């Protein structure tokens, strides 16, 4: 079996950038997805360029911060910010202009490309794939990239995805045992499993803008542990990135 440990939220704070970098240099993370509208975007770009082996994707968002574009009336609140989470976006979905979705997501992708980075894959912040999948699929075809496999989406066409996507390593599920259980579920197969991760060092920015904070340091500890790397080696698990699909 093969595993992609993808680190979401690259750029959300300096601590997240450096936590993901350390999880790449000393751990099992080989892929990460960058928020184009994130506070530490420029730092993330700099770090990515200094570490070309770190596979970069776009962490497309309609539920975090402010959009790249202005005038997106169906996607933003009175303050010009995106709705705060999946539920808020879903509840107003009937009024969302999918043309605005396409333009904003394209702007996010183009910002990353304009910074000089190559993009291998797309995923979304707060797992909004089921709400915007037709647009995301179209953009994946346009840019020739892979996608995260979402349980609520069945038709990926010719777009490459992992065989399975695991969200188990999150919040109360952040443990070495969680990863061991996932490995035992797929050991002996040729399947590619993506495990979602969010490693980070806690900083003031992260404390201010994210509700998911403390578990990120535990994720970082596990993902950089010699125990995990030794176990994966013993089980003959190959660690790959989205570039390898």
Show where each model-derived region lies.
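Boundary/entry segment of secreted carbohydrate-active catalytic domains
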Residues: 1-14
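Structural preference for beta-strand elements that scaffold enzyme active sites
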Residues: 2-4, 29-33, 53-59, 119-123, ...
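Active-site beta-loop-alpha junctions enriched in small/polar residues
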Residues: 8-10, 35-37, 59-63, 125-127, ...
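Acidic (Asp/Glu)-rich catalytic clusters
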Residues: 20-26, 44-55, 73-80, 114, ...
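Active-site gating loops and adjacent loop-to-helix segments of metal-dependent hydrolytic enzymes
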Residues: 66-94, 211
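Catalytic domains of cell-wall/extracellular-matrix polysaccharide-remodeling enzymes
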Residues: 98, 106-171, 181-187
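C-terminal domain-boundary segment and adjacent tail
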Residues: 210-245
């Amino acid at each position: 079996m093969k595993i992609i440990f993808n680190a979401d939220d690259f750029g959300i704070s300096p601590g997240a950038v450096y936590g993901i970098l350390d999880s790449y240099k000393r751990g099992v993370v080989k892929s990460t997805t960058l928020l184009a509208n994130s506070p530490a975007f420029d730092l993330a770009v700099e770090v990515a360029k200094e570490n070309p082996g770190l596979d970069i994707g776009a962490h497309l968002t309609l539920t975090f911060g402010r959009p790249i574009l202005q005038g997106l009336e169906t996607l933003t609140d009175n303050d010009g910010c995106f709705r705060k989470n999946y539920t808020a976006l879903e509840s107003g979905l009937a009024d969302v202009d999918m043309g605005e979705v396409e333009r904003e997501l394209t702007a996010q992708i183009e910002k990353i490309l304009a910074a000089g980075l190559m993009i291998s894959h797309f995923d979304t912040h707060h797992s909004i794939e089921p709400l915007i999948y037709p647009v995301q699929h179209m953009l994946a075809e346009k840019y020739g990239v892979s996608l995260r496999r979402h349980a609520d989406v069945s038709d990926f066409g010719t777009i490459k995805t992992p065989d399975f996507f695991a969200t188990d390593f999150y919040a109360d599920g952040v443990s070495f045992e969680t990863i061991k259980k996932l490995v035992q579920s797929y050991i002996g197969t040729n399947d590619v499993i993506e495990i979602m991760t969010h490693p980070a060092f806690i900083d003031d920015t992260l404390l201010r803008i994210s509700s998911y904070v403390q578990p990120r340091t535990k994720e970082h500890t596990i993902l950089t542990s010699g125990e995990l790397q030794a176990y994966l080696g013993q089980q003959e698990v190959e660690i790959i990135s989205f570039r390898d699909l």
